[in-house]
Amino acid sequence: IGDWLRAQGVSSAIVLSSIWCRCQRTAEELKYGPVQIEPALASFFDEPLKAKKLNQQLQQRIANALPNKKNQALILVTHHVNIREFVGKDIGSGDMILAQVNAKGQMISFRHYPSP
């Protein structure tokens, strides 16, 4: 996935990951540098009542990152339940979402990319 992202022009990125080890491994394998663990990206599959709260925390984290990211991509590695809560769509394992967000970190529009 990291090679594919580079081929698309993503040369520099801030990478945030769920604490879950499979997400961390994926994030590290992108090879964009240190991975930051973000609690708002943790799966709530077994605790669906946490969905709204974690999504709000994620939006705040994105909003906080926007002013400082400069020309870097902001890559989030997380779980299908989190993605569904954020964009309202189920996607497959390894698929990617390119999301346009507003200054509050709220999704405006998105494009779905199947796993390369």
Model-derived features with residue positions:
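Flexible, glycine-rich active-site loops centered on histidine and acidic residues
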Residues: 85
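A short, acidic, amphipathic alpha-helical segment used as a generic capping/interface helix at domain edges
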Residues: 57-67
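Beta-strand elements within well-structured catalytic alpha/beta cores of enzymes
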Residues: 16-17, 72-78, 82, 99
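Glycine-rich phosphate-binding loop signature in dinucleotide/nucleotide-binding domains
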Residues: 8-10, 65-72
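Active-site-proximal alpha-helix that buttresses catalytic centers in soluble enzyme cores
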Residues: 1-39, 44-48, 53, 89-102, ...
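Short amphipathic alpha-helix initiation/capping segments at coil-to-helix junctions
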Residues: 51-55, 76-79
